[in-house]
Swiss-Prot record:
E.C. code: 3.6.-.-
InterPro entries: G_TrmE (IPR031168), GTP-bd (IPR006073), GTP-bd_TrmE_N (IPR018948), GTPase_MnmE (IPR004520), MnmE_dom2 (IPR027368), MnmE_helical (IPR025867), P-loop_NTPase (IPR027417), Small_GTP-bd (IPR005225)
Pfam families the record matches: MMR_HSR1, MnmE_helical, TrmE_N
Cellular compartments annotated: Cytoplasm
Amino-acid positions noted as binding GTP in the UniProt annotation, renumbered to this chain: 234-239, 253-259, 278-281
Swiss-Prot/TrEMBL cofactor(s): K(+)
Binding-site residues, K(+): N234, T253, I255, T258
Alphabetic keyword roster: Cytoplasm, GTP-binding, Hydrolase, Magnesium, Metal-binding, Nucleotide-binding, Potassium, tRNA processing
GO annotation, cellular component aspect: cytosol
Species annotation: Lactobacillus johnsonii (strain CNCM I-12250 / La1 / NCC 533)
SUPFAM superfamilies, A to Z: P-loop containing nucleoside triphosphate hydrolases
Cross-referenced NCBIfam families: mnmE_trmE_thdF, PRK05291.1-3, small_GTP
Descriptive protein name: tRNA modification GTPase MnmE
Gene name, Swiss-Prot/TrEMBL: mnmE
Amino acid sequence: MAQVLTQFDTIAAISTPIGEGGISIVRLSGEDAVAIANKLFKGADLTQVPSHTIHYGHIVDPKTKDVVDETMVSVLRAPKTFTREDMVEINCHGGMIVTNDILQLLLANGARMADPGEFTKRAFMNGRIDLTQAESVMDIVRAKTDKSRQVAMTQLAGGLLDKIRTMRQELLDTMAHEEVNIDYPEYDMDDLTSQEMKKKAEEVSKQIDQLLKTAQEGKIIRNGLATAIVGRPNVGKSSLLNYLTQDDKAIVTDIAGTTRDTLEEYVSVKGVPLKLIDTAGIHHTEDKVEKIGVERSKKAIAEADLVLLLLDASQDLTDEDKNLLNLTANKKRIIILNKQDLGTKISQEMIREITDNPIIVTSILKQENMAALENAIEQLFFSGIENSQNQILVTNQRQAGLLAKAKQSLEDVVNGIDDAMPLDLVQIDLKNAWDTLGEITGESAPDELITQLFSQFCLGK
């Protein structure tokens, strides 16, 4: 864990969204947090109250003596706080003016405006959390479904941290054993030590493999299942988007080519996080703007985790339909036969001869059989991840990339031993793997990485 650092100044920020609301919270952290808040607070003497208590009073401008707001103030003393520093949280009435006035008074009386993510960064620097837990804090804030929140909570509880630390300890024990052999060569334990190193490298590599297998699942749960809504013009793509989002996010008309670009929307369908992409109709066109939309649609299909392919069941299968069936043949997809209320010229049996993908017959405008579509999405998504609530998942590209890098170093260890390389050289690769795993938790992460990571957080967090 990172070194405990205590020589920080005192920071302040608004921790709740700016705007009208019932309550806003202005947060302080640092050695002088209580003293600064006490300059403004008229009620109890905050410097004398017990830790983890809340007090009623008023925030008063020390210079003008004007009462700014009626508040409840929480005093939280180190080390049992989020940042492991003294903290104060001022609960005031929601509203842009009053909240900002309180913040400005805190800044005028000795606090500094917090950088984005600085509260969480201090929690990391003071050993309260590691980098995987810090990332999970933002995952909780940004969670779009219960599933993504549950996975983030598992990370915050230290699931991935414990796994990484166990692997690092195993590698450290192996390196320590090898150091004895290097320091005392008279015992001639090279063969024994090399086999031990190889075995341990292979064991840890397998553990990393198991984590890497969860990376795609973790990405989907964290970011949403990238779902492309695909079909030729005027088959009901935008109507499907509007049904799933329960909002008119796309223009629905009878004019072919109305959607000229890709539209994105996040929704939860029966607990499945979907990042919906309503694509432009893929068809031949001479319109330059439409051509751009068509190319973007093809790119969206290539990058999609799931394709919802719409066909107009009331019309014969067209060449454009056949092209889309071929274009999406290798994707996980659901075939939707829309407009069945207008007649049926494309049957399930006809499509079944082409593919074994799930087929849903519906009228989206009349919302007929839409529950079957939602059930099909749920079944496809949860078929292999029913236990992900308590499962340790790799949830972002940073973690996955470092795991892959560590695995490569371990493979270099195995190859080096097989090629009879000197053990002191092989151990360099073993230490590289150990260091790389430490970057995941922050135990060996460079300062610039830590700064960059926390800069992505919101103010007040």
